[in-house]
Swiss-Prot record:
It comes from the Viruses. PROSITE patterns: PROTEIN_KINASE_DOM (PS50011), PROTEIN_KINASE_ST (PS00108). It is an enzyme of class 2 (transferase). This is Putative serine/threonine-protein kinase R436. It comes from Acanthamoeba polyphaga mimivirus.
């Protein structure tokens, strides 16, 4: 199938509200990723909201929209992203085989986290929150790529009011979202999701809460203390537990997290060079 200057080559995701294809730019012959939104299953306003934020972001660690095409005849919107070669999501990174004594791998993971923090910091500085930070939405090749802004909000944009409710991926959603309170600081919930992502990476794919049922998971996150992080690096574990503190006001700022990670990266770098 060909529309405009793009062809659809391979379906990689099929959901009610959207389908995602690997495609080709027929002019440059470059691979692209194409999201197809259907107006029948999602309002045009909602689709425009989804593409607004990635279209205005400009950061080396954030995936940016390449193009979009509206097909009035079929009531579909085609959103085109660059295809990133040789990527792996953080979810598929084999951290369960991670040896805590391997300083090179530790340095690599900390460097990944610093790049993620850089992307979040840039977004927050521009009053944008991601709202679905998790290993699946972080891709790696030679650098980090934060993706999937379908749930993101711009905090100061009256055209697209901030969405309320339990939005996100359950295991990575902050307690205050489950509490269903009126006033939520969504920058703080992004920070919490970052903390759970760090916990996952540094605890061999384990998470601080475990439940078989959605309702049980909701209750645990809302009411129970998280299982203590045990990465083998007490300073990192202490930072992770602060980031996933149940009280949003006790969580460090994104700049404080970056400072701590850079400090730890310097220490690891010194040890690596010393051992050489």
């Amino acid at each position: 199938m060909i529309f405009s200057n793009y062809s659809l080559d391979k379906l990689i995701q099929n959901r009610k509200s959207k389908r995602i294809f690997i495609g080709t730019d027929t002019i440059t012959l470059q691979k692209v990723v194409i999201k197809i939104y259907d107006d029948k299953n999602k309002s045009k306003e909602s689709i425009l909201r989804d593409i607004h934020i990635p279209s205005i972001l400009n950061h080396p660690n954030i995936i940016k929209i390449k193009d979009y095409v509206e097909d009035l005849d079929s009531n579909k919107m085609y959103v085109i992203y660059p295809y990133i070669d040789n990527t792996i999501s953080l979810r598929n990174l084999p951290v369960d085989k991670f040896d805590v004594t391997d300083l090179f791998k530790l340095y690599y993971i900390i460097d990944i986290l610093i790049q993620v923090v850089d992307a979040i910091s840039y977004m927050h500085d521009n009053n944008i929150v991601h709202r679905d930070i998790k290993p699946d939405n972080i891709l790696l090749n030679d650098k980090v790529h934060l993706i999937d802004f379908d749930l993101s909000d711009q905090l100061d944009n009256p055209k697209f009011p901030v969405r309320k409710g339990t939005i996100g991926t359950p295991n990575f959603m902050a307690p205050e979202i489950w509490w269903k309170i009126n006033q939520v600081d969504y920058k703080k919930t992004d920070i919490y999701s970052l903390g759970i992502t760090m916990y996952y990476l540094l605890n061999k794919r384990k998470l601080p809460y475990k439940a078989k049922k959605y309702s049980e998971l909701e209750y645990q996150i809302a009411n129970h203390k998280p299982k203590i992080s045990n990465s083998g690096y007490p300073e990192l574990d202490k930072l992770i537990m602060k980031i996933i503190d149940k009280d949003p006001q006790n969580r460090p700022t994104i700049s404080e997290i970056k400072q701590k990670l850079n400090h730890f990266k310097t220490i690891v770098d010194t040890r690596v060079n010393f051992n050489e």
